[in-house]
């Protein structure tokens, strides 16, 4: 599914990743652990296509395609989901509106019919019940006024709705209380199957 070959990356002239090789196959959950500043988040951002990094050498092959040639939107549409360590707040945009737009964009890219409002809300209800989330999550502005734990729960909610082939959790367990961590762990369990894979970036062993 994902294979990183001889990857070297620098930021502002400083080498962060040197000659990295990594393989993630279907059905696997791979954890990458290390202290702050060791390049963990750099790796997740490079896979997702975030700007600001220079790839000096190497390839990132996802489903037999070198995704370094794709922009971030194409990488997401091809089945890569990055749950951010610090999810962005967007006041004025409802969580449900953002999610439906993102979901239907991916469906359209892959040649599938877009979900109508009814089908979308039914799916939201099923997923939110799995995670024990309050109905108000959908109507609130995207991450605006959310606590740190609520933002992380929302990332997991979006992950289960989007159904990506590869999910990257970038220190999503950082700063969470026990109850929030339980919801994250349940989300990971619901997501896991033999058809997808997960890359977990963390410096804790608890998740």
Predicted regions and their residues:
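Q-loop/switch helix immediately C-terminal to the Walker
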Residues: 86, 92-108
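ABC ATPase NBD Q-loop/coupling interface
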Residues: 59-75, 143
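ABC ATPase C-loop
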Residues: 159-160
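The feature captures the beta-strand-to-loop junction immediately N-terminal to the Walker
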Residues: 33-35
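Walker B catalytic motif
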Residues: 171-172, 179
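Conserved hydrophobic segment flanking the Walker A/P-loop of ABC-type ATPase nucleotide-binding domains
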Residues: 24-26
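Conserved structural motif at the start of ABC-family nucleotide-binding domains
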Residues: 2, 17-19
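H-loop/switch region of ABC-family ATPase nucleotide-binding domains
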Residues: 201-203
